[in-house]
Amino acid sequence: MKQRLDRIARMSEEQRLNSIHQFWNLPEDAVFSPEVVALVCDMSLSWLQAKRCQGNGIPFVKVGPRKVGYTKRDVLEFLSKNRYLNT
């Protein structure tokens, strides 16, 4: 997990903005890494990982034996369902 946290921390501001821009410009069936989703949603990687384990976060796909990804469609649906008018 530390490697992933370091990966985001090592990204330049330009790389972060490019990742976010790419997310918004690709089709809804595109699959994104947890790092990109964390940047787009302003969430931590540890939050995404915890919610994957608990089963109540953004739906994910296994893209390899040790890799997960998120479709843009699932990310947008999750954000839409979790909108609030007050606290």
Q: Which residues fall in each region the model found?
A:
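Basic Lys/Arg-rich amphipathic helical interaction modules
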Residues: M1-A50, K67, K72-T87
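The DNA-recognition helices of helix-turn-helix-type DNA-binding domains
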Residues: G55-N56, N82
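Short Lys/Arg-enriched helix C-cap and helix-to-coil transition segments
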Residues: P59-V68
